[in-house]
């Protein structure tokens, strides 16, 4: 692995980050640094807290489309007009088959469903799928099931699964991307899950027209909530979504690879001790620059995403190996 010698200014930021003494202004001001400095600071923090490993996870879109919520970025929302496959909850046999297909590569497998929440019958079937995966694979199981009540959270705690619930963006900016539910609804679920002792993965999407300050506010909320894993996504605008139209009209500017990498670095510096995982949109935004994100990250989502294709898994494994990291 490469050796880094930080200059005095970068060393000061590194030390403040390591001792978690950076405030919002400090983090926003990081945007003024060049990318190389941010990568050097981030890599130094990664080596300090999370070593040289890249943890791999995969997801399955187990129920697709016709979502009641009006998130402007989501191709599964019935308020958008994206042409995607729609289907009800997959059978436990199909879910298990999908899990087994990635077991060789992934450490975690997440069952993801569209919609604000799940019905009681869907939840019962998902619990059965969790048991199947736990009994027949070595995978750790995660679920992304929307806004869950206490009884469902308790049942998931008994199965020792990790809950995923993205905040998506800052509280201040949330109304610009969704009005059918509130930011606080997500916060309440995360707080209740943490109270019950469930592991929590949460994060957001960079590139939806938000400011750098909004990105920092999101990161500071994740820090305050003490989530276990931070899932970062880069907007891949899908035809038929309202955000796609906003980008095409020039209302929003699509995030570029430099801004994306700088944002990921700021996440590392804001949350030095957390698992930072890069998920959807990395292929679309970063392209050949993906390899540099490994200096910042602790994890990658591999395989396909919800309604878009991911990079070939073998290409990801080769990239990790060539950059000198371990799985």
From Swiss-Prot:
Tagged with keyword Cytoplasm: no
Main enzyme class: transferase
Known catalytic reactions: (4R,5S)-dethiobiotin + (sulfur carrier)-SH + 2 reduced [2Fe-2S]-[ferredoxin] + 2 S-adenosyl-L-methionine = (sulfur carrier)-H + biotin + 2 5'-deoxyadenosine + 2 L-methionine + 2 oxidized [2Fe-2S]-[ferredoxin]
GO molecular function: 2 iron, 2 sulfur cluster binding; 4 iron, 4 sulfur cluster binding; biotin synthase activity; iron ion binding
Entry function: Catalyzes the conversion of dethiobiotin (DTB) to biotin by the insertion of a sulfur atom into dethiobiotin via a radical-based mechanism.
Family per record: Belongs to the radical SAM superfamily. Biotin synthase family.
Name the UniProt record assigns to this protein: Biotin synthase
The organism's taxonomic lineage, starting at the top: Archaea, Methanobacteriati, Methanobacteriota, Methanomada group, Methanococci
Gene name of the encoded protein: bioB
